Amino acid sequence: MERIKELRNLMSQSRTREILTKTTVDHMAIIKKYTSGRQEKNPSLRMKWMMAMKYPITADKRITEMVPERNEQGQTLWSKMSDAGSDRVMVSPLAVTWWNRNGPVTSTVHYPKVYKTYFDKVERLKHGTFGPVHFRNQVKIRRRVDINPGHADLSAKEAQDVIMEVVFPNEVGARILTSESQLTITKEKKEELQNCKISPLMVAYMLERELVRKTRFLPVAGGTSSMYIEVLHLTQGTCWEQMYTPGGEVRNDDVDQSLIIAARNIVRRAAVSADPLASLLEMCHSTQIGGTRMVDILRQNPTEEQAVDICKAAMGLRISSSFSFGGFTFKRTSGSSIKREEEVLTGNLQTLKIKVHEGYEEFTMVGKRATAILRKATRRLVQLIVSGRDEQSIAEAIIVAIVFSQEDCMIKAVRGDLNFVNRANQRLNPMHQLLRHFQKDAKVLFQNWGIEHIDNVMGMVGVLPDMTPSTEMSMRGIRVSKMGVDEYSSTERVVVSIDRFLRVRDQRGNVLLSPEEVSETQGTERLTITYSSSMMWEINGPESVLVNTYQWIIRNWETVKIQWSQNPTMLYNKMEFEPFQSLVPKAIRGQYSGFVRTLFQQMRDVLGTFDTTQIIKLLPFAAAPPKQSRMQFSSLTVNVRGSGMRILVRGNSPVFNYNKTTKRLTILGKDAGTLIEDPDESTSGVESAVLRGFLILGKEDRRYGPALSINELSNLTKGEKANVLIGQGDVVLVMKRKRDSSILTDSQTATKRIRMAIN
């Protein structure tokens, strides 16, 4: 206060004011501070000071011919004085106004194209709806968010190459455009920007906005997709929020959302297959999201979500070093620990082997609806500070933290046996067993935890076992805070390894992620996800499995046909028939398979019985391990539409219907494609006789005895000749092949030879 009084005193003397306002600044240090370097030290002051001058702007000399010296009001628009240090003229801000009103108009066609991101934003805001303003305490936490709606996901280097190629195509310098997206964008932009008069530098800046994801670490309460972030200043203050629904959608948000859904579906499906890692990779490589290959998106998209990170790890990409437990992202902020196996007894006297972390550590926990700071020692929770949207969210965080602490009273709070299994029916590891148990019911856990008296600390309240707030008491070591805990800000990525059960570990062997951590939440993807892998056929239910299986056979019929006759076992083991098995009643799968395989063998052995439609119809049933039995079936049951439906062995049914005239196959009334039968099939007789394993030598030769029937042929030894009765009573001489390898050619040559032998 004294200083201020003294200064006021000084200022009241006129001499002081004169010295301060009139004296030149000639202290070297000050001059140096404000004149060294190109960087403006006080931009806003400079701007105000410049704009207070009469001619603060410099312009090219040509302006004097294009703009009059005075405007209609008689104000001077430019000065006859040249700018010191350049051959430009000094111009008044009024000249800009005159130019905007009366200057030449050029073509505006390129503006919406170059400034696309701005035009799009205006459209989104025009169609967005702003709701009421609510006044309430905002729990904001800093998260890394995308601040640039509507961008492609190119890396900075890829974008730089595209921009150089589009804006400065004649500049020297090697540019390699390799990725699909780079080539498409370059072609598109070159066409759009032909004869564009906007300054190349501006075009380059705007292209960068369109091509690269820009992220910032911002305090957010609520939506984090880029469409919400662009109106952050309108939707949340320190003590208020305004509801907002975006108008329209932007591709980058749609890609992020659809990628998460695809990754979750793929990880869930892979986890239950025989070789989860191989299956996961096969599915990632054969899936497209909005027409772009999923693996390309994974390489470029920085989204951090458990399933997405598992897919990235499988592809050998780096991921964040934080780990996931109970749906929360944990990041260790200090301390260290070593792992040791320990056997513990639950309240139900069940023995659990847990990996105990020995040592003092501090973590931040960040979830979708709650965040926390956790301090723990060996099997002891020291302190937990939680903040969340509501009681439910806070309870979820507390359960996860308590289980993670591995305290004895938590393990003793278990009632009943722990036998939770994952989707593949394997037992979960002990830590996830405990987590699932208490997520189902945490009453005993909270009651047994213990409570303590608390001191009054600003911004903190206690929480009782029934999750109500209190200022006097709280669960031991646990407090609820008004302030959120910021997400981990670093974008550092680490090298990880993944085992065949999809457990992701860092280089020190700590498990960062596992399929148990993948959310079960179902959503509807905003972009079309096309899973080409047969493993994903069942995602849309039994009907989709049925249709996809038959479509696959039809699409690959030429190779399937060859395998059917030459190497049936390999065909039956194809993974494309795996999903179909879930439609066949378990008890009878083996019998069906045995029956169909026998039927197929007869078809191979008996001339003229090859039947394309029947083979296609029954093939999926032959994939199950066969049981030998004498059972014959006239129809086979599949479980679709909530009940058993029949496929007739001979003839059409609602499930499988082949129209001979139109050559179309319909499955459950849905068109499944065109099915072309072999030319020989429709005209049975000599033409359809396919003597597999026999060479036709010519016409009947009496020296080899009476004509045998086709069934008697099987008794011949290799190289032995015989007459055989085929088709409509014609007889030809055949020899049983010495080698099996040429069997397939028989079906092609047999028809020709038979015709020659008979004619």
UniProtKB/Swiss-Prot annotation:
Record keywords: Cap snatching, Eukaryotic host gene expression shutoff by virus, Eukaryotic host transcription shutoff by virus, Host gene expression shutoff by virus, Host mitochondrion, Host nucleus, Host-virus interaction, Inhibition of host innate immune response by virus, Inhibition of host MAVS by virus, Inhibition of host RLR pathway by virus, Inhibition of host RNA polymerase II by virus, mRNA capping, mRNA processing, Viral immunoevasion, Viral transcription, Virion
Molecular function as annotated in GO: RNA binding; RNA-directed RNA polymerase activity
Keyword Nucleus listed: no
Alphabetical list of SUPFAM superfamilies matching this protein: PB2 C-terminal domain-like
GO CC terms of this entry: host cell mitochondrion; host cell nucleus; virion component
Biological processes, Gene Ontology terms: 7-methylguanosine mRNA capping; cap snatching; DNA-templated transcription; symbiont-mediated suppression of host cytoplasmic pattern recognition receptor signaling pathway via inhibition of MAVS activity; symbiont-mediated suppression of host gene expression; symbiont-mediated suppression of host mRNA transcription via inhibition of RNA polymerase II activity; viral RNA genome replication
Cross-referenced InterPro entries: Flu_PB2_2nd (IPR049110), Flu_PB2_6th (IPR049114), Flu_PB2_C (IPR049115), Flu_PB2_CAP-bd (IPR048298), Flu_PB2_middle (IPR049111), Flu_PB2_N (IPR049106), INV_PB2 (IPR001591), PB2_helical (IPR049113)
Compartments where found: Virion; Host nucleus; Host mitochondrion
Coarse class of the protein's main subcellular location: virion
Segments carrying motif Nuclear localization signal: 736-739
Residue stretches in coiled coil: none
Residue numbers marked as site, Mammalian adaptation: 627
Domain of life, source organism: Viruses
Biological role stated in the UniProt entry: Plays an essential role in transcription initiation and cap-stealing mechanism, in which cellular capped pre-mRNAs are used to generate primers for viral transcription. Recognizes and binds the 7-methylguanosine-containing cap of the target pre-RNA which is subsequently cleaved after 10-13 nucleotides by the viral protein PA. Plays a role in the initiation of the viral genome replication and modulates the activity of the ribonucleoprotein (RNP) complex.
Family that this chain belongs to: Belongs to the influenza viruses PB2 family.
Subunit structure: Influenza RNA polymerase is composed of three subunits: PB1, PB2 and PA. Interacts (via N-terminus) with PB1 (via C-terminus). Interacts with nucleoprotein NP (via N-terminus). Interacts (via N-terminus) with host MAVS (via N-terminus); this interaction inhibits host innate immune response.
Annotated protein name in UniProt: Polymerase basic protein 2
Lineage: Viruses, Riboviria, Orthornavirae, Negarnaviricota, Polyploviricotina
Gene this chain is encoded by: PB2
